């Protein structure tokens, strides 16, 4: 009897993960405003950016804050951040990706979307914040660069991204807060 209860609990998590993959795989595009906090250990940097996801073409972003970086943008094409171009005022810098992809303000959302489209979450649970029901998912990866963990919170209704925390070797290095979101 206990085994049956445990197996039923596992099935629910798989269904939630499947629903998330199906939703993000079918999503044609969205526009979002992101607030990103990057914790480099010795300093914490805050960024804001407008992000555009386009399933059929490239993703793009434009930094809106801090003012000293405002206007810098980038594009990422393909399914794995292998094609990344940093742009500013008509100039482009190709191959600007860091060695440890998915943990920088420039590529975090792109890689997180790939996890939501294709990844199998290690854990799925429900939470409530400010009266909104949320689905929370945790993704874990071991690589030659170390352990990467990502936790993402989506609205239960509509599966809209709300917040994410990214960890490298157990240390939180990045948070993403989605303050505006519109599917296109």
Task: For each feature predicted by the language model, list its residue ranges.
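Sec-dependent N-terminal signal peptides
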Residues: 1-3
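N-terminal leader/targeting segments and the immediate start of mature chains
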Residues: 5, 9-58, 68, 182-184
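Short, exposed beta-strand/loop patches in secreted or surface proteins that constitute
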Residues: 22-23, 49-54, 74-77, 122-130, ...
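Flexible, processing/modification-adjacent segments and terminal tails
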Residues: 25, 85-143
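One face of beta-strands
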Residues: 28-36, 43-53, 57-63, 72, ...
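Short, surface-exposed beta-strand/loop "edge" segments at domain boundaries and coil↔beta transitions
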Residues: 40-45, 67-73, 90-96, 144-150, ...
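An acidic-aromatic
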Residues: 53-111
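Gly/Pro-enriched, hydrophobic low-complexity segments
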Residues: 60-65, 123-184
